[in-house]
C-alpha cells in the first residue's frame, strides 16, 4: 500500500507540477469514468496560429485541465511530453459524430503546409500566448535551416545551449582509430563497455522527453545518459537506444537482423555519468537519418521546455560539415509496401514504477471510426493492436463490407461466418463436465479463515461424502478424456489417495491463479495410488561413456564430413574494407539492403526478432512461427525422456533450416532400438542412441504414419510403408569442428558445465547462441527429490544441479528477471515431456546460475546436434507447416504496430538501476578458441456498439489526495474469487491484476519464489491531429506485462462489475484461448451487454 501511495504521489507531481511554456486551451474531454474500466483522457488541441490561453482547472465536476502543444507551423515540434492535470471525464456524447473519410491514397502524404484545423475540428480563437508577466512568448526555433529564419538576438538559454554543444562531451577519436577496420573496432568495443562507470542518478520525475518533428516523419528525443529507450517507425522499423553504452541499433521488421549504428565508423559522442544526449531520427526522401549528440546538461534541462527544444533544434540542423560534433548516419531504405503511419516512443522509470508509451499518428491514413478502435486498443495497453481490432469488429457484428476490414489480413474477412459460428458453438459435453467438476473441487478445497481473514485449505476433518463422490467423478472424467492413456494399466487411488494428492498439489501451488489451477488439475497423476512413483517411470537418462584418448585419436584420423554452417563463420572476417566500400555511396548514405545482407552472415539461420534476440527468446510466443506448432509431448510411463528431448531438438532444427514442421514418430525410434520392450521402457538411454538409430536406418516417418502410445513400445522395428514420409532422408552427421583443441564428436557437440565452473558466463552465452541458431538445446538435469508432478513451473526456481543427472529435457528459451533482493538475473525456459498439464503448460523456468552455494549447475550438460539436413519429400507441400520465422514479409502485412509479450518487461529491466546486466544487443562472442568438448577446465460504452475508452485503474490525476486512490482502485461491493493465499480484505479492494508470486517448489520443499513483485503503472499517450488522449493501466506485477493476455484489462460497462468480468475471464480463458479471437469468444460467452474482453 505504501508503494501504491508513492506511485500516486509521483504521478500527481508529474501531472500537476510539470510547467510548460506553451499555450493552454479548453476542450471537451472524452472517455469513461475513472472508477474502474473507464479512462481519464487529456485532449490536447492546437490553434490556428499555435497560440491559446488558459481557461480553468481540472475538477471533480468533469472539466479537464488541458495543455495544448505548440503549433508545428511556428515551432519545431507538434507535441511535447509535458503532462497536464486531469479531472473526471465526461461522456462520449460531447464528441462530434464520426465521419467516414475517403479511402487513403497509397502514397505518403506530405505534412499540411498550414496548421489550420479542418472544418470538422474545433477551432479556437487566435490569441497570442502570454506569460504571467504579460509578455509574448517568442516562437520556438524553426525546423528549417537557419538561413531561412529571421535572425534574432541570442537569449541566455540559447547561450547555455550553444555553450553545451560547443564542447565535445567525450574524447575525440583519432584519425588512426577512424580509419581502423571494423574487425579492430569490434574487438575494442567489449572491453570499453566493460570498463564504463555506473550511469548517473537520473531525475526522479523526468529523465527523458520526446517531441514530434514538424517537417519530417520523425521524432526528437532528449534525456540523461543511462536511460534505455525505443523508437518504432510503424510498421517497418524499431530503433534501440542503450545510452549507457552509447549503443544505437536499427531493426527492420521486414528482415530479421539488427544494424549497428557503429557498423561503419566508431561513435564519437560517448555517454558518461553526468552527461545528457540528444537523438534525432526521421525519414526524408526514403532516407532514414539518425543524429546523436552527447553534451553537458544545463541545470534546467527538463524544468524549462525551451532549453530542451533549442538543444534539439541545434542538433537537427547539423550539416555534414559539422559531423565532427554530431554523429550522423544515413540509410537508404528499400522499397516499402506502405508509408510510415505512426511513431511510438517507449521509455521506463523504474524508480517510480512507470512505463510510458507515446503514439504519434503521422497522417490520417485510416477512417475515423477505424482510428477510434485502434486508439482504444492502444490506450488499454494492448501489445497486439491487430488482435484487439479484430475482436472489436466481431463484437460490433461488422459486415464484411465494412471499410475497417481492409486494415486486417484477408483471412478474417473471408472466414468471418465460420469464426462467429465457432465462438457460438457448444463445448464437448464431457469437457464441460470436467471443467465443472474442477470448479466444484476448487471451491470445496478452500474455506474462509475468519481469524486470519483469508482462504485456507481444508483438512481431512473436512472430508465428507459429497467431496468423496466428486473426487470419484473427477478421476473418472480425467481417464475418459486422457488421449495419451497414461492411466491405462496404472493402479488408481481411492478417494483418500486422490484427496491427498490434490491437497499436496494445491499446497505447493498455494498462490497460483484460479485459471492456472484449472490446468494443473488436468494432470492425471493426481488420480494415482502411489503418486511418488509417477516421476520414476518418466526419468531415463543414462550418461554415455567418457571418450578415451584412443577414440579421440581415431576420430581425428577419420575423413571428416562437411562442417556445420554455424561453424564456418568467423564473425570478425565478415566485414572487410572492400565490403564496407560497397555499402556506402559517395554521399555517405548506407544502403540498408546491403547492410542487412552482411548482418545476416553472422548466422546462416538465426533471424533476430521481437520473439528471439540476444536478451530474450521464446519462439512459442510467436503464434505464426514454425516452432510454435511443436506441441508438448507426453512420454507416458516409459523412460524415454532422451528420445523426446532429441525429437524436439531435431524438429526445431528443421524449422530453423526453413523445412517446416512435420511431427516425427517417436515410436519408430523406440521400436528400432536393438533392445527388448522392457529394456527400452525401463532402462533409459541418451541422445547418442537416437542419432545411431536414425543413421543406421536412414529413415524417420511422420507421427501420423506411426503414432506414439507408450503401451505400444514393443521393440519391433516396423518396415516403412510406401505411403510413409521419410523425414531423415540424406541427412549427414557432421563433425564438431570448432577452432582450437577439441575432440571430434560425430553428429553432436557436448558442453559440460563443470568445465566452465570458473567462467559460467561463457557457458551461458554458448547455450543462448545455440538456442538462437537451432531453436533448442538438449540438457541433462537432476529431477529426483527436486521436480515432481506438483512442480509449479510458472515461477522461476532457484535450484542446484547434481553430478549424476537422471533426466533429459530441452532448453527452448531464456530471459531476464529481477530477484527479490533486487538483483538483475537470467533464467532458462525449459520444456519437459511430461504432458501439457504438468508444470506451466509443459514448461518450467530455472535461474541460470542457481544459489551461490551450489557445487553443480542445474544444467549438468548441454548437447546440440551437428547435422547437414536435406528437405524431405513432403517439405514443399501443404502438409508441412512452413517456417514463418524466415518469411518475415508475411508478418509485415499488419497495419498496426505489434510488440512481443516481453517488450515492456525488457524495457523496464534495461532501465532498472544497477545497469550491470550484459547488453542484449551486442553481437555473438567468438568462441573459436574455447574447448567445448568437455576435456578441459579452462573453459482492453455502448452495449450495442461498444466504444469504451482506456482502462482506468488509477485516481483522478487532477486531484491528488491519497483517499482518491482507494476510491479508484476498489469497489467495496464487488465480489471476486480470491486466489488461495489472498486475504479477504485484499480481494475486496483489488481492482487490478492479481499476478501472484507463487512458490517455486519441489516434492520435498516449498521454497518461496525468487522473483521480485513489482507494481507498474503504464501511462499511454495517443497524439493525433495535435490532440493528446491519455490512458492508464495498472499492473500488480511487472510479469503481467509479459503474458499474452491479462484479465486485468477486462472491461465492464458498469464499473461496479469490473471484478466480476475479470473473474469470468480467468475462469473461461482455457475455453477460448485457441479461438481465432479469444476476446470475442469470452465476450460472446459472457453476454455482450456486460463485459468486453477485446483488450485482454
From Swiss-Prot:
Top-level taxon of the source organism: Eukaryota
Polar residues: bias regions: 123-147, 925-952, 964-975
One protein family per Pfam: Peptidase_C1
Free-text description of this protein's post-translational modifications in UniProt: Proteolytically cleaved in both blood and liver stage parasites. Precursor of 130 kDa is processed into 72 kDa and 55 kDa forms. Proteolytically cleaved by SUB1.
GO CC annotation, single: plasma membrane
Disulfide bond residue pairs: none
Membrane topology, as annotated: Peripheral membrane protein
UniProt entry keywords in alphabetical sequence: Cell membrane, Glycoprotein, Host cytoplasm, Membrane, Secreted, Signal, Zymogen
UniProt xrefs under Gene3D superfamilies: Cysteine proteinases
Start-end of Low complexity biased regions: 77-97, 976-1006
Bias type Basic and acidic residues, positions: 102-113, 149-161
InterPro entries: Papain-like_cys_pep_sf, Peptidase_C1A, Peptidase_C1A_C
Chain segments carrying region Disordered: 28-205, 916-952, 964-1006
Places the protein is found: Cell membrane; Parasitophorous vacuole; Secreted; Host cytoplasm
Region forming the signal peptide: 1-21
Molecular function terms from GO: cysteine-type peptidase activity
CDD domains: Peptidase_C1
GO biological process, one term: proteolysis
Glycosylation site residues: 92, 204, 607, 637, 662, 671, 712, 892, 951, 981, 1039
Family membership noted in the UniProt record: Belongs to the peptidase C1 family.
Free-text function comment from the UniProt entry: Putative cysteine protease. Probably involved in merozoite release from the parasitophorous vacuole during liver stages.
Protein's name in the database: Serine-repeat antigen protein 3
Organism: Plasmodium berghei (strain Anka)
Lineage, highest ranks first: Eukaryota, Sar, Alveolata, Apicomplexa, Aconoidasida
Amino acid at each position: 500500500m505504501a508503494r501504491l501511495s508513492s506511485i500516486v504521489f509521483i504521478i500527481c507531481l508529474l501531472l500537476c507540477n510539470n510547467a510548460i511554456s506553451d499555450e493552454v486551451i479548453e476542450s471537451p474531454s472524452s472517455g469513461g469514468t475513472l472508477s474502474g474500466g473507464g479512462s481519464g483522457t487529456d485532449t490536447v488541441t492546437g490553434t490556428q496560429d499555435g497560440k491559446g490561453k488558459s481557461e480553468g482547472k481540472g475538477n471533480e465536476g468533469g472539466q479537464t485541465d488541458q495543455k495544448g502543444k505548440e503549433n508545428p507551423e511556428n515551432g519545431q515540434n507538434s507535441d511535447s511530453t509535458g503532462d497536464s492535470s486531469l479531472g473526471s471525464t465526461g461522456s462520449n456524447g460531447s464528441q462530434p459524430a464520426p465521419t467516414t473519410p475517403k479511402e487513403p491514397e497509397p502514397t505518403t502524404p506530405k505534412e499540411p503546409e498550414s496548421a489550420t484545423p479542418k472544418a470538422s475540428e474545433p477551432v479556437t480563437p487566435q490569441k497570442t500566448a502570454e506569460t504571467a508577466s504579460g509578455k509574448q512568448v517568442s516562437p520556438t526555433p524553426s525546423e528549417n535551416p537557419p538561413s531561412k529564419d529571421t535572425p534574432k538576438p541570442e537569449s541566455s538559454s540559447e547561450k547555455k545551449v550553444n555553450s553545451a554543444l560547443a564542447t565535445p562531451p567525450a574524447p575525440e577519436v583519432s584519425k588512426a582509430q577512424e580509419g581502423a577496420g571494423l574487425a579492430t573496432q569490434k574487438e575494442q568495443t567489449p572491453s570499453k563497455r566493460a570498463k564504463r562507470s555506473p550511469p548517473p542518478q537520473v531525475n526522479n520525475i523526468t529523465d527523458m522527453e520526446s517531441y514530434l518533428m514538424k517537417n519530417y516523419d520523425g521524432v526528437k528525443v532528449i534525456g540523461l545518459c543511462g536511460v534505455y529507450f525505443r523508437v518504432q517507425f510503424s510498421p517497418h522499423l524499431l530503433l534501440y537506444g542503450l545510452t549507457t553504452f552509447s549503443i544505437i541499433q536499427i531493426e527492420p521488421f521486414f528482415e530479421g537482423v539488427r544494424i549497428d549504428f557503429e557498423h561503419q565508423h566508431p561513435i564519437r559522442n560517448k555517454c558518461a555519468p553526468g552527461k545528457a544526449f540528444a537523438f534525432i531520427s526521421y525519414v526524408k526522401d526514403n532516407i532514414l537519418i539518425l543524429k546523436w549528440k552527447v553534451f553537458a546538461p544545463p541545470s534546467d534541462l527538463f524544468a524549462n521546455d525551451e532549453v530542451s527544444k533549442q538543444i534539439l533544434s541545434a542538433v537537427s540542423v547539423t550539416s555534414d560539415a559539422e559531423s565532427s560534433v554530431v554523429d550522423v548516419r544515413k540509410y537508404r531504405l528499400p522499397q516499402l509496401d506502405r508509408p510510415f503511419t505512426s511513431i511510438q516512443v517507449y521509455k521506463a522509470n523504474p524508480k517510480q514504477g512507470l512505463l510510458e508509451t507515446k503514439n504519434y499518428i503521422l497522417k490520417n491514413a485510416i477512417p475515423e471510426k477505424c482510428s477510434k478502435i485502434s486508439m482504444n486498443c492502444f490506450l488499454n495497453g494492448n501489445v497486439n493492436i491487430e488482435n484487439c481490432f479484430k475482436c472489436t469488429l466481431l463484437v460490433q457484428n461488422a459486415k464484411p463490407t465494412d471499410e475497417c476490414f481492409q486494415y486486417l489480413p484477408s483471412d478474417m474477412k473471408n472466414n468471418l461466418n465460420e469464426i462467429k459460428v465457432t465462438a457460438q458453438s457448444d463445448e464437448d459435453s464431457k469437457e464441460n463436465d470436467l471443467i465443472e467438476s474442477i470448479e466444484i473441487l476448487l471451491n470445496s478445497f478452500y474455506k474462509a479463515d475468519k481469524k486470519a481473514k483469508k482462504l485456507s485449505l481444508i483438512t481431512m476433518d473436512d472430508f465428507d461424502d459429497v467431496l468423496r463422490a466428486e473426487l470419484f467423478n473427477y478421476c473418472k472424467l480425467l481417464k475418459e478424456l486422457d488421449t495419451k492413456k497414461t492411466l491405462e494399466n496404472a493402479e488408481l487411488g481411492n478417494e483418500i489417495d486422490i484427496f491427498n494428492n490434490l491437497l499436496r498439489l494445491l499446497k505447493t501451488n498455494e498462490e497460483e491463479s484460479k485459471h492456472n489451477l484449472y490446468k494443473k488439475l488436468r494432470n492425471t497423476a493426481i488420480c494415482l495410488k502411489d503418486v511418488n512413483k509417477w516421476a520414476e517411470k518418466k526419468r531415463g537418462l543414462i550418461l554415455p561413456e567418457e571418450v578415451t584418448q584412443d577414440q579421440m585419436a581415431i576420430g581425428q584420423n577419420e575423413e571428416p564430413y562437411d562442417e556445420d554452417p554455424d561453424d564456418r563463420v568467423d564473425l570478425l572476417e565478415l566485414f572487410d574494407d572492400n565490403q564496407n566500400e560497397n555499402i556506402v555511396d559517395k554521399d555517405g548514405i548506407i544502403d540498408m539492403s546491403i547492410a542487412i545482407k552482411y548482418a545476416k552472415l553472422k548466422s546462416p539461420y538465426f533471424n533476430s526478432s521481437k520473439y528471439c534476440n540476444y536478451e530474450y527468446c521464446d519462439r512459442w510466443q510467436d503464434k505464426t512461427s514454425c516452432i510454435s506448432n511443436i506441441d508438448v509431448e507426453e512420454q507416458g510411463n516409459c523412460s524415454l525422456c532422451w528420445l523426446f528431448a532429441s525429437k524436439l531438438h531435431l524438429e526445431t532444427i528443421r524449422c530453423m533450416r526453413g523445412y517446416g514442421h512435420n511431427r516425427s514418430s517417436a515410436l519408430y525410434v523406440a521400436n528400432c532400438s536393438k533392445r527388448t520392450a522392457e529394456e527400452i521402457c525401463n532402462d533409459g538411454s541418451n541422445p547418442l542412441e537416437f542419432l545411431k538409430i536414425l543413421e543406421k536406418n536412414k529413415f524417420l516417418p511422420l507421427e501420423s504414419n506411426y503414432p506414439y502410445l507408450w503401451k505400444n513400445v514393443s521393440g519391433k522395428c516396423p518396415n516403412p510403408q510406401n505411403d510413409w514420409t521419410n523425414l531423415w532422408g540424406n541427412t549427414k552427421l557432421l563433425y564438431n569442428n570448432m577452432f582450437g583443441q577439441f575432440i571430434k564428436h560425430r553428429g553432436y557437440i557436448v558442453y559440460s558445465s563443470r568445465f566452465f565452473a570458473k567462467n559460467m558466463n561463457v557457458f551461458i552465452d554458448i547455450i543462448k547462441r545455440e538456442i538462437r541458431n537451432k531453436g533448442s538445446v538438449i540438457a541433462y538435469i537432476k529431477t529426483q527429490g527436486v521436480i515432481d508432478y506438483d512442480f509449479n513451473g510458472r515461477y522461476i526456481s532457484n535450484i542446484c544441479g547434481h553430478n549424476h543427472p537422471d533426466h533429459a529435457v530441452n532448453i527452448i528459451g531464456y530471459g531476464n528477471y529481477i530477484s527479490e533482493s533486487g538483483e538483475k538475473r537470467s533464467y532458462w525456459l525449459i520444456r519437459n515431456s511430461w504432458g501439457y498439464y504438468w508444470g506451466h503448460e509443459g514448461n518450467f523456468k530455472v535461474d541460470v546460475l542457481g544459489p551461490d552455494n551450489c557445487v553443480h549447475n542445474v544444467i549438468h550438460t548441454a548437447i546440440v546436434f551437428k547435422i547437414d539436413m536435406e528437405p524431405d519429400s513432403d517439405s514443399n507441400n501443404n502438409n508441412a507447416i512452413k517456417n514463418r520465422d524466415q518469411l518475415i514479409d508475411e508478418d509485415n502485412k499488419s497495419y498496426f504496430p505489434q510488440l512481443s509479450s516481453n517488450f515492456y518487461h525488457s524495457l523496464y529491466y534495461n532501465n532498472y538501476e544497477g545497469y550491470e546486466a550484459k547488453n542484449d544487443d551486442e553481437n555473438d562472442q567468438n568462441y573459436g578458441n574455447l574447448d567445448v568438448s568437455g576435456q578441459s577446465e579452462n573453459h482492453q460504452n455502448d452495449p450495442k456498439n461498444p466504444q469504451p475508452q482506456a482502462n482506468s485503474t488509477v485516481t483522478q490525476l487532477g486531484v491528488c489526495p491519497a483517499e482518491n486512490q482507494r476510491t479508484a482502485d476498489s469497489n467495496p461491493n464487488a465480489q471476486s474469487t480470491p486466489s488461495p493465499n489472498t486475504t479477504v480484505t485484499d480481494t475486496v479492494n483489488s481492482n487490478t491484476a492479481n499476478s501472484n508470486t507463487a512458490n517455486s517448489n519441489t516434492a520435498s520443499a516449498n521454497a518461496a519464489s525468487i522473483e521480485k513483485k513489482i507494481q507498474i503503472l503504464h501511462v499511454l499517450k495517443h497524439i493525433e491531429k495535435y490532440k493528446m488522449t491519455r490512458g492508464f493501466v495498472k499492473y500488480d506485477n511487472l510479469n503481467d506485462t509479459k503474458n499474452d493476455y491479462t484479465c486485468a484489462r477486462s472491461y465492464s460497462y458498469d464499473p461496479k462489475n469490473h471484478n466480476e468480468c475479470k473473474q469470468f475471464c480467468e475462469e473461461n480463458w482455457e475455453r477460448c484461448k485457441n479461438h481465432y479471437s479469444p476476446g470475442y469468444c469470452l465476450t460472446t460467452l459472457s453476454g455482450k451487454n456486460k463485459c468486453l474482453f477485446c483488450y485482454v
